Structures are given as C-alpha cells and as structure tokens.
Swiss-Prot record:
GO annotation (BP), single: viral translational frameshifting
PANTHER family: REPRESSOR OF YIELD OF DENV PROTEIN (PTHR16135), SHIFTLESS ANTIVIRAL INHIBITOR OF RIBOSOMAL FRAMESHIFTING PROTEIN (PTHR16135:SF2)
Transferase recorded as keyword: no
Modified residues (N-acetylserine): S2
Segments carrying motif Nuclear export signal: 261-269
Role: Inhibits programmed -1 ribosomal frameshifting (-1PRF) of a variety of mRNAs from viruses, such as HIV1, and cellular genes, such as PEG10. Interacts with the -1PRF signal of target mRNA and translating ribosomes and causes premature translation termination at the frameshifting site. Regulates HIV1 GAG-POL expression by inhibiting -1PRF. Exhibits antiviral activity against dengue virus (DENV) and can inhibit the replication of all DENV serotypes. May block the protein translation of DENV RNA via its association with cellular mRNA-binding proteins and viral RNA. Isoform 4 does not inhibit programmed ribosomal frameshifting (-1PRF). Does not bind to ribosomes.
Name of the protein described by the UniProt record: Shiftless antiviral inhibitor of ribosomal frameshifting protein
Gene name of this polypeptide: SHFL
Top-level taxon of the source organism: Eukaryota
UniProt source species: Homo sapiens
C-alpha cells in the first residue's frame, strides 16, 4: 500500500471511531477520498447536519460550528447525518467530542502468554482491544493492578522520586532511604523518552528471585526486571491478558501510536493484511465471497 493509501486508511479509521463505528467503512472511505482525508472537517460537518436535522430542544446543547459550504451542501454527508439521528442524551457526548475533534484514547499494555509476547497499544477508551502479532488473537489489556515495566515511584518517607522496573502492587526500596515504596504507575515505552537517560542506580528489589535482591526479601514474589526473568528462565509475561470476546464491532482499534515505539503505518498495514486474510477464511468456510 502506498503512503497515500496509509494516510487515507488512518483518516477513515479516525472518522469511524468518532462516531463509534456507526459510519460504514465504505461511506467513510468515499467521504475521505472526496475531501482529501479531512476527517476533522467531515466529522464537524456531520455533527452540524445532525444538529440542523434533529429539531429537538436537546440540539441546543450541541455546540456545532458552521462548516465549509461544499461540505454543508454535500449529499453524502447529509445522508450520514440523517442515519445518525435522533440526537439523544446517550449520544450527545459522542457528537460533541466529534465536533471538538476528540477521540478519547489510552495507552494500554497487552500480553499473550501463548506467544510470550508483550506490547503496548494506544486504543479507544470505549474499546480497549489489541491483536497479538504472532498468533493474531485479540486480547483485553493487562489489568491495571497487574501491569509491569518501567515504573514511577514517589517515596512517602523522604519525598524522593525515582524510576525502576517493577510490577504494580510489588514494593521496591527507595534509592534514597531504603523505605519500601509501591509503584504509582507503569510508564509506556515511547520514542520521545530519552534512551540515554539511564539511572545511575542498579536495579534492586525485595522479590525473592531478583538478580540483585534486597534484604529482607519477600518470599513467593517475583522480580519484574528483564535480567531477573532471563536469569531465572522465566517467561516475559508476568500476567497474561484475557482473550477478547467480540461484540460484533468491526472498527479497527489502532488509532494513533502517539509516540509509542511501534510504527503506526506498519500497524495499519498489518491490520489490513490480517483483515483480508480473515475475510478469505470466512469465504472459505461459507463456500463463497460475502456480499
């Protein structure tokens, strides 16, 4: 796929996600081709159309800007707006966020125990799902209280702030005073994080199998540091993700990596390839192409 095709696909996915998958891929693609992948302008024009067509008092609560004339008069945009009616208390926030060009998203950690593969993905808050690149199974994110990786710590005793490898819920000794401190959060890997910013402290924690164990240690605990995991012949996955049970939505969940280490263009190309393979598998099972 060309770079132009990748950009088109990204804009289609963003437009569809703004309206929670209620705009078909075919319609979104046609609009993005017609208006140069301007998902922001088309999204706002759809919201404007909804407000104009709805006619309820509730529409007064929707702050819709007047779109460009060519979009305002476009029949395809008007048709999409009509298909999204009526405006309700339940979908008002969706339309307002689309007007503001917002897609609430979060960085989440995923882990496939079968492949011993760990990755991060930026996903929509409304549908936190990602596919393992190795086995292609879809997974829910690792529970927040079980995440692991580079953690952020704030010592309540000496007020020292530091970073180090850990799993949520497992204490590590403060580099300043030695007081056991629980991690505040796990930091996702990012391109914009300085790779040369290395800690001057060697990792050390109270886990029983830590390669640089701090005493007194806690029996039955396991160190999250990659060096300890490798030295002890343990898998990379500390806590696996639960398999995702599909609800039937077909909107791809890769929106924007936002600085995460994986490249968005490659991810979209992979997703497209996998979607094509899935369609072929369904056709083989059903004995012919789908309409």
């Amino acid at each position: 796929m060309s770079q132009e095709g990748v950009e088109l696909e990204k804009s289609v996915r963003r437009l569809r996600e703004k309206f929670h998958g209620k705009v078909s891929s075919k319609k979104a693609g046609a609009l993005m081709r017609k208006f140069g992948s301007d998902h922001t302008g088309v999204g706002r024009s759809i919201v404007y159309g909804v407000k104009q067509k709805d006619g309820q008092e509730l529409s007064n609560d929707l702050d819709a800007q007047d779109p460009p004339e060519d979009m305002k008069q476009d029949r395809d945009i008007q048709a999409v707006a009509t298909s999204l009616l009526p405006l309700t208390e339940a979908n008002l926030r969706m339309f307002q966020r689309a007007q503001d060009d917002l897609i609430p998203a979060v960085d989440r950690q995923f882990a496939c125990s079968s492949c011993d593969h760990v990755w991060w993905r930026r996903v929509p808050q409304r549908k936190e799902v990602s596919r393992c690149r190795k086995c292609r199974k879809r997974y829910e994110p690792v529970p927040a209280d079980k995440m692991w990786g580079l953690a952020e710590f704030h010592c309540p005793k000496c007020r020292h702030n530091f970073r180090g490898w850990a799993q949520m819920g497992s204490p590590s000794p403060c580099y300043g005073c030695g007081f056991p401190v629980y991690p505040t959060r796990i930091l996702p890997p990012r391109w914009d994080r300085d790779p040369d910013r290395r800690s001057t402290h060697t990792h050390s924690c109270s886990a029983a199998d830590c390669y640089n164990r701090r005493e007194p240690h806690v029996p039955g605990t396991s160190c999250a540091h990659p060096k300890s995991r490798k030295q002890n012949h343990l898998p990379k996955v500390l806590h696996p993700s639960n398999p995702h049970i599909s609800s039937g939505s077909t909107v791809a969940t890769c929106l924007s990596q936002g600085g995460l280490l994986e490249d968005l263009d490659n991810l979209i190309l992979e997703d497209l390839k996998e979607e094509e393979e899935e369609e072929e598998e369904v056709e083989d099972e059903e004995g012919g192409p789908r309409e």
